Regions:
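Charged, solvent-exposed interaction patches on well-folded alpha/beta domains
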Residues: 1-18, 23, 56, 80-268
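Aromatic-capped interface at the extracytoplasmic side
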Residues: 18-39
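Preference for short coil/turn "hinge" residues that link or interrupt alpha-helices
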Residues: 22-24, 35, 46, 52-55, ...
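Short extracytoplasmic
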Residues: 40-73
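Conserved short hydrophobic interaction patches
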Residues: 50, 74, 234-238
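Structural recognition of beta-strand segments within beta-rich domains
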Residues: 73-75, 83
Length: 268
C-alpha cells in the first residue's frame, strides 16, 4: 500500500510540475518584440501582417510551419522564411526572396483549358505575361516597371495566381520541366544575364538566345548542366576562331557531334 501511495505521489508531483511549466510558458513567454531580417521588397509591417503573429501571442504555442506557409502564399517574392524564438519574448523572421528571372509570354497555340473527368472545363489561359522565379513560382503580372531579363515563349500559363506555381496543359509538362531545369542551371553557372529568351515552341528542342548573337538549340531532356557547359565552351572557341563575336546557330541536339555552329547569312 505504501508503494502504491509513493507512485501516486510521484505522478501527482510530475503532473503539478508539467502544469507549472505550462502555466509559466503561457504567462512569461509572450511575444513583445517582432523583428524581420533579410533584404526584402516588402516592409516589415507587411511581413508581420502576413505572418498573423501579434504582440501577446505565446512563443511556444505558435505553429511555425503554418506561419511560414502564410507568408509564402501572401507574399509571392518570398522564397523562404526562418522563424527564430528569442527568449523571453522575441520572435524573428529571417526572409530570403526570389528574383524575377523570366517572364512567360502569352501563348495562344496549344491547349488552353483542361477538362475534368466529368467534362467541366476549368482553367483559363493567361491573358497577360507573368513573371516567374527560377523554380517556376508565379510572382506577378509583367508591367512597365516590373520585367524580367528572359522572355519565355511556348508555354500556356493556366489560371495564374501570384504565389502559386506555374501550371500548364498536360501536353506542355515536359517543356515546363525543361524550362525550370535550364533556368536553374543558368543561375548556377552564372549565365542568366547572357540569355534574353527561351523558345519552347519546338517539339523536341528549346532555343536559347545567347549573348544577343547565338541561337542555341538544346534538347528538352537530358543533362542540362552538361549542355550549357558544352555550349559555353563551343561559343568561346568559335569566338576565338573568328577573332570576334560569332553570330549564328549553335546546335547541341545532334548525337554525332557535341555542337555544330552555322553562321548567320550575311545580308546583301
Amino acid at each position: 500500500r505504501r508503494s502504491r501511495l509513493g507512485v501516486l505521489f510521484k505522478l501527482l508531483c510530475l503532473a503539478a510540475l508539467v502544469a507549472a511549466l505550462t502555466f509559466g510558458a503561457t504567462v512569461f513567454f509572450q511575444v513583445e518584440t517582432i523583428a524581420v531580417t533579410g533584404d526584402s521588397r516588402y516592409t516589415q509591417d507587411e511581413i508581420i501582417a502576413a505572418s498573423g503573429v501579434q504582440v501577446g501571442d505565446n512563443l511556444f504555442r505558435m505553429n511555425k510551419k503554418q506561419i511560414s506557409q502564410e507568408i509564402l502564399h501572401q507574399l509571392p517574392y518570398v522564397e523562404s522564411v526562418s522563424i527564430l524564438r528569442g527568449l523571453p519574448s522575441t520572435i524573428t523572421f529571417q526572409v530570403t526572396e526570389w528574383d524575377a528571372v523570366a517572364q512567360v509570354e502569352v501563348y495562344a497555340q496549344g491547349q488552353t483549358e483542361e477538362s475534368g473527368e466529368e467534362g467541366e472545363s476549368q482553367q483559363a489561359a493567361a491573358k497577360e505575361a507573368w513573371l516567374i522565379s527560377v523554380g517556376g513560382k508565379l510572382l506577378e503580372p509583367v508591367s512597365a516597371s516590373h520585367t524580367a531579363p528572359i522572355s519565355v515563349t511556348g508555354l500556356t500559363a493556366l489560371a495564374p495566381e501570384a504565389g502559386s506555381m506555374l501550371a500548364v496543359p498536360q501536353d506542355q509538362q515536359s517543356k515546363l520541366t525543361a524550362l525550370t531545369n535550364v533556368l536553374e542551371q543558368l543561375q548556377q553557372q552564372g549565365m542568366i544575364s547572357r540569355v534574353s529568351s527561351v523558345d519552347l515552341t519546338h517539339v523536341s528542342c528549346m532555343v536559347l538566345r545567347l549573348d544577343g548573337s547565338i541561337d542555341a538549340k538544346l534538347p528538352l531532356t537530358g543533362d542540362t548542366a552538361y549542355y550549357l557547359r558544352a555550349l559555353n565552351a563551343a561559343v568561346e572557341e568559335e569566338n576565338r576562331r573568328r577573332g570576334g563575336q560569332a553570330v549564328g546557330t549553335m546546335d547541341l541536339t545532334q548525337k554525332e557531334y557535341t555542337a555544330i555552329f552555322t553562321p548567320a547569312e550575311s545580308g546583301g
